[in-house]
Design a protein with these regions (language model features):
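N-terminal Sec signal peptide and the immediately downstream disordered periplasmic leader
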Residues: 1-59, 65-69, 182, 231, ...
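Acidic, small-polar-rich N-terminal luminal/periplasmic segments of exported/outer-membrane proteins
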Residues: 25-156
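Short polar catalytic/cofactor-binding loops
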Residues: 33-38, 169-172, 225, 241
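Outer-membrane beta-barrel translocator/receptor signature
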Residues: 85, 100-101, 113, 122-125, ...
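Periplasmic-side early beta-strands and strand-to-turn transitions of outer-membrane beta-barrels
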Residues: 156-158, 167, 180-271, 342-357, ...
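Flexible glycine-rich, low-complexity coil/linker segments exposed to the extracellular/periplasmic environment
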Residues: 261-306
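Outer-membrane beta-barrel transmembrane strand signature
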Residues: 295-324
Length: 370
């Protein structure tokens, strides 16, 4: 009896040992640079979440606003004039002159303005989200946290080849094509070309125009080069150009008020619409759905009204050079040189009526060196 029990224990122990080895082989160590050096995610002392480039492509995440759906306590929101990043519910206002309280770092270069958070994601190795003040390692404008985006690098000594992927989204009638090509040149130099083209027709119907929105057109192109002349020295360079155009808004029209007595704004809008766009007035009543106010469609109907939807166009250009040198005393010296610039034009229908009586155009240019 004792011999049988001993055999059973031995068999159980061996099975458990085998299962443990299988799980150990399946687990992949995640390396991050949240503390300015390469460490295992398990050893990092700060609160950090990581999402890989493969997951970003698999989930169809196009920008940092989409990343917020997967990362706890992180959110990026957009309004007509600005982009606001917040961590744990804390952010800055919509004033475009403000710098964000959440620092954005792309390949080591700090991008301080909210408009730069609209930069699309493509050919990314990983995105690290650090929660809490990060001023000690990342400097100012990281009061609530930091976002560390690491682009995919050329593979020195790797194979010549690449990848192209095509995605189609039925609900938004969106088409996305992206890819990259790795070109090795010798044993210590390689080049990587990557691109992304995205067209999104939107999911809200404009009842007057018969079109959908908000539409988004995005094109991005990146050139990367890596040179490793010795085991101690490596230089990585990348340059990215991008264009982002969006027309329309998810805001539902709420100023076309036919209730009595009419307000000055709604009365003027109705007067103009009745005389210049009579079909608009008829269209409003067709699918208000029994509301007391003829304010257009409800959010539930996923429809909006308007002749001149708001629009925005942003052009970006970013360059980063990273130099890493392992010194003889075991220390590592790193240097980052960067240039980032953008320009944008925003068109806003300020009267919110069917006829664009009052409009406003905003434009700006920005450039930084670091």
């Amino acid at each position: 009896m004792k011999r049988l029990i001993s055999s059973a224990i031995a068999v159980t122990a061996s099975v458990m040992f085998a299962i443990t080895n299988i799980h150990a082989a399946e687990l992949e160590e995640i390396i991050v640079t949240a503390t300015k050096k390469e460490e295992s995610l398990q050893d990092v002392s700060v609160s950090v979440s990581v999402i890989s480039g493969d997951k970003i492509q698999e989930a169809g995440l196009h920008d940092l606003k989409d990343i917020g759906q997967y990362i706890p306590n992180f959110n990026v929101s957009e309004n007509a004039i600005s982009t606001i990043a917040s961590m744990r519910g804390v952010g800055v206002g919509a004033n475009q002159s403000f710098e964000q309280s959440v620092g954005l770092f792309v390949d080591g270069v700090h991008l301080a303005k909210g408009r730069q958070f609209r930069t699309g994601l493509f050919d990314v190795e990983r995105v690290e989200v650090l929660r809490g003040p990060q001023g000690t390692l990342f400097g100012k404008n990281t009061l609530t946290g930091a976002i560390n985006v690491i682009s995919a690098k050329p593979e020195i000594g790797g194979d010549f080849g690449g990848q192209i992927s095509l995605a189609v989204e039925d609900e938004n009638s969106a088409n996305i094509i992206d890819g990259h090509l790795n070109i090795p040149a010798g044993d210590n130099f390689a080049v990587r070309l990557s691109f992304k083209d995205r067209e999104d027709d939107g999911y809200i119907t404009n009842a007057y125009l018969g079109t959908t929105g908000p539409t988004a057109d995005e094109q991005m192109l990146r050139f990367s080069a890596s040179w490793q002349p010795s085991d101690d020295l490596r230089i990585d360079m990348k340059h990215t150009d991008g264009e982002h155009v969006r027309v329309g808004s998810t805001v539902v029209q709420k100023t076309f008020d036919m209730a009595m007595p009419p307000t000055p704004t709604s009365g003027l809008a109705f007067l103009v619409a009745q005389n210049f766009f009579p079909s608009f007035v008829a269209n409003v009543g067709n699918y208000v759905g029994g509301e007391d106010l003829n304010t257009g469609a409800t959010k539930g109907a996923m429809q909006t009204l308007g002749i001149n939807p708001v629009g925005t166009q942003t052009n970006t250009s970013d360059t980063a050079i990273n130099i890493s040198y392992d010194m003889a005393n075991g220390m590592n010296m790193k240097a980052t040189i960067g240039n980032a610039k953008y320009d944008y034009v925003d068109g806003i229908d300020a009267d919110f009526g069917p006829f664009q009586l009052v409009s406003r155009d905003d434009w700006s240019e920005y450039e930084q060196d670091s």
